[in-house]
Swiss-Prot record:
Family: Belongs to the mitochondrion-specific ribosomal protein mS26 family.
Any one GO cellular component localisation term in the record: mitochondrial small ribosomal subunit
UniProt entry keywords in alphabetical sequence: Mitochondrion, Ribonucleoprotein, Ribosomal protein, Transit peptide
Subcellular location field: Mitochondrion
Quaternary structure annotation from Swiss-Prot or TrEMBL: Component of the mitochondrial ribosome small subunit (28S) which comprises a 12S rRNA and about 30 distinct proteins.
Pfam family, one: MRP-S26
Lineage of the organism: Eukaryota, Metazoa, Ecdysozoa, Arthropoda, Hexapoda
Name assigned to this protein: Small ribosomal subunit protein mS26
One GO term of the biological process aspect: mitochondrial translation
Chain's gene name: mRpS26
UniProt-recorded Gene Ontology molecular function terms: structural constituent of ribosome
Length: 225
């Protein structure tokens, strides 16, 4: 076993003009006692320890304490043994004294008590199950009402969407009004191009024949800051 320790060096112990880094020392430490897993040493294998000699007073006192302990322990054992025997005799006597009619009456009494307990427990169970059944019915009814309300809202939204599409369908291009739609588109061209001048005026269209005046034209728009 090794023990690592830092060696403390003072300035007086250091030689002049030399520096010492972290000094490290190793110290060998032996076991204080022999480990328990090692066998007996050969030098002590056949050694018989000398028995300590007791004085007559000490031996007499130890014997007195030993006898006192044995006597007390024997008394406790005897008391417990008598208690067990008395309990067995009492139980056996009670059992022997009872007649068959008394045993039948006692058994019937136990049956009646058991039946009363079962009836009380059954009543409590029925009440608990009835309460749970009512709560479950109320929960299901609430869920059904919520589902019905959601279904009505969904139908209302669907009807509004259908009405909106019907209104939009009036402007749809079909086979019947396809030619008229083409003629209308050719007669009214739409140009999304525009231009902006230095004054911030916005001109829609690709070409403009006039310069901007004080009042903007229909195709002219003034940009606000």
């Amino acid at each position: 076993m090794l023990r690592a320790g830092c060696q403390l060096l003072t300035q007086s112990t250091l030689p002049t003009g030399k520096t010492v880094g972290n000094s490290f020392a190793l110290e060998f430490v032996r076991w204080r006692r022999k480990p328990r897993w090692l066998p007996v040493a050969k030098s002590k294998m056949f050694r018989v320890p000398e028995r300590k000699k007791q004085s007559e007073e000490e031996r007499t006192e130890l014997m007195r304490l030993h006898n006192q302990y044995k006597t007390q322990l024997r008394s406790v054992r005897q008391f417990l043994r008598e208690e067990v025997v008395r309990h067995e005799e009492t139980s056996t006597a009670d059992h022997i004294v009872l007649t068959p009619e008394q045993e039948e009456a006692e058994f019937q009494k136990c049956l009646d008590a058991n039946a009363a307990w079962n009836a009380a427990i059954a009543k409590e169970r029925d009440q608990r199950l009835a309460k749970k059944r009512e709560e479950k019915v109320a929960y299901i009814q609430e869920r059904l009402e919520a589902q019905q309300l959601r279904e009505e809202e969904r139908k209302e939204q669907a009807n509004q969407r259908v009405l909106l599409e019907i209104e939009r369908s009036k402007n749809y291009i079909t086979r019947e009004n396809l030619d008229a739609a083409i003629e209308t588109a050719l007669a009214n061209p739409v140009d999304h191009n525009f231009a902006i001048d230095m004054a911030g005026n916005l001109y829609h269209g690709r070409s403009t024949s006039q310069l901007p005046d004080a009042t903007p034209e229909p195709n002219q728009q003034v940009l606000s800051n």
